[in-house]
From Swiss-Prot:
GO biological process entries: defense response to virus; innate immune response
Needed cofactors: Mg(2+); Mn(2+)
Keywords: Antiviral defense, ATP-binding, GTP-binding, Immunity, Innate immunity, Magnesium, Manganese, Metal-binding, Nucleotide-binding, Nucleotidyltransferase, RNA-binding, Transferase
Protein name: Cyclic GMP-AMP synthase-like receptor
Reactions mediated catalytically: GTP + ATP = 2',3'-cGAMP + 2 diphosphate; GTP + ATP = pppGp(2'-5')A + diphosphate; pppGp(2'-5')A = 2',3'-cGAMP + diphosphate
Lineage: Eukaryota, Metazoa, Ecdysozoa, Arthropoda, Hexapoda
Record function comment: Nucleotidyltransferase that catalyzes the formation of cyclic GMP-AMP (2',3'-cGAMP) from ATP and GTP and plays a key role in innate immunity. Acts as a key sensor of double-stranded RNA (dsRNA), the presence of dsRNA in the cytoplasm being a danger signal that triggers the immune responses. Directly binds dsRNA, activating the nucleotidyltransferase activity, leading to synthesis of 2',3'-cGAMP, a second messenger that binds to and activates Sting, thereby triggering the immune response via activation of the NF-kappa-B transcription factor.
Binding site for Mg(2+): E69, D71, D189
UniProt similarity note: Belongs to the mab-21 family.
InterPro entries the UniProt entry points to: Mab-21-like_nuc_Trfase (IPR046903), Mab-21_HhH/H2TH-like (IPR046906), MAB21L/cGLR (IPR024810)
Enzyme Commission number: 2.7.7.86
Residues binding ATP: S57, E69, F70, D71, Q241, E242, Q243, E244, K262, S275, Y276, Y277, I278, K279
One annotated GO molecular function: metal ion binding
Naturally occurring in which organism (per UniProt): Asbolus verrucosus (Desert ironclad beetle)
Length: 383
């Protein structure tokens, strides 16, 4: 079993260092150039912009397959003088943000140029509105893109590392830049988020910050599942990505295990299990086990975590790492989870009694070549 998993990890679910290096250079150059255009077009964005956070599975080291999609958070700040106040909502994992001293800030010099635009991000009671922020962000991205030279239906973005064709698409809370040239084609999701320091860390049953070197957290304009009579546009999802990245780092077989679990999920067709649910199982495992566990053989780590994962599915509950009141599986039907639990039980049994079935369960086949006694691998499907 160990040799099989090591082969799969090495040949299929790990990205080459050359690909990682190339994509990092191109992506950083494109994003910094485009953000510069956005700052030129909008004084409010220029005032609030802090930095880019390179988020998602690629930068966490958890991506399976070719790196073609990237998640970037544009971190913005709110004027302190306006007294932004975060309060936990009735939905675990979500908060409200209200500007308690907006009128006084509007009289400050810095508000003279941007005050009217800033008020458009709020609702009638001075709560920061996800809907309004998304509309503002969509307009800004299009204005920045429209300033670029055109080539047919696309725009040309010239950066220090080359010129790329860019087109804009909208998807959920993100504005997607589709970037391509003769050698590369990638999608970059840009999401406007707001960043806060440790003085605003949420309480009320939220876990305290376990990573002192990362005091900041974000709020993201992602809507919750909530009754129609609720003010949905006031709900902001909390994000502790920087802390999570530190918690899962420098643990030898942790990231290969996550990739194997994602590969298994995809091949079994369990697409209702979000990658973040798997990451949350891992975060709980980090709490429950010391660092030496992740240095044990990959087969031991993978099978142990797979059994942990099955237990969560059997109990129909994966507690949100940062607030256990939030069950990440609450939106999935009981019958669906029962069927998944039964399937995982059979998978675990087969893997333990017949390790060669791992190839099939992970969607990979291999052929033995007697000529040189080496295995040659071929993916059944690209993830």
């Amino acid at each position: 079993m160990e040799n099989i998993l090591q082969d799969i990890n090495k040949n299929f679910i790990s990205l080459s260092n050359d690909e990682i290096r190339r994509n990092n250079i191109i992506l950083d150059s494109v994003v910094q150039t485009f953000v510069g255009k956005m700052k030129e077009k909008d004084p409010l964005f220029n005032l609030m912009y802090r930095r880019v956070f390179y988020g998602g599975s690629f930068y966490d080291g958890l991506r399976v397959g070719k790196p073609k999609e990237f998640d970037l958070d544009l971190l913005l700040t709110l004027p302190n003088f306006a007294q932004p106040v975060l309060t936990t909502s009735n939905i675990p994992g979500f908060v409200f943000l209200k500007l308690e001293n907006l009128d006084a800030w509007m009289r400050q010099p810095e508000a003279q140029r941007v005050g009217a635009s800033f008020k458009k991000l709020l609702d009638g009671r001075n709560y920061l509105s996800t809907a309004n922020v998304l509309v503002w962000m969509e307009g800004l991205v299009h204005r920045a893109a429209n300033d670029l030279p055109a080539r047919g239906s696309k725009r040309l973005l010239t950066t220090p590392v080359g010129t790329f064709e860019v087109s804009i698409h909208k998807g959920g809370p993100a504005m997607t830049l589709h970037i391509c040239d003769s050698e590369i084609e990638i999608d970059v999701d840009l999401v406007a988020c707001f960043v806060f320091g440790s003085n605003k860390w949420p309480t009320n049953r939220f876990r305290s910050n376990p990573v002192n070197s990362k005091p900041e957290f974000f709020i993201v304009p992602k809507k919750p599942r909530a009754p129609e009579d609720q003010p949905i546009q006031r709900y902001w999802r909390l994000s502790f990505q920087e802390q999570e990245r530190v918690l899962i780092d420098n643990k030898q077989y942790l990231k290969p295990t996550v990739k194997l679990l994602k590969q298994l999920r995809d091949n079994l067709g369990h697409n209702f299990i979000a990658s973040y649910y798997i990451k949350t199982v891992i975060l709980h495992a980090v709490d429950e086990r010391d660092d030496s566990f992740w240095r044990r053989p990959l087969s031991h780590v993978f099978m142990t975590i797979l059994k942990d994962f099955k237990t969560y599915i059997e109990r129909k509950k994966i507690p949100y790492y940062w607030n256990s009141n939030n069950n990440l599986l609450s939106g999935i039907g009981e019958r669906t989870l029962e069927n998944m639990n039964n399937r995982l039980r059979n998978v675990i049994r087969d893997m333990e009694t017949r390790p060669e079935t791992m190839w099939e369960y992970l969607g990979i086949k291999y052929t033995m070549y007697s000529k040189d006694s080496k295995k040659q691998f071929k993916e059944l499907s690209e993830v």
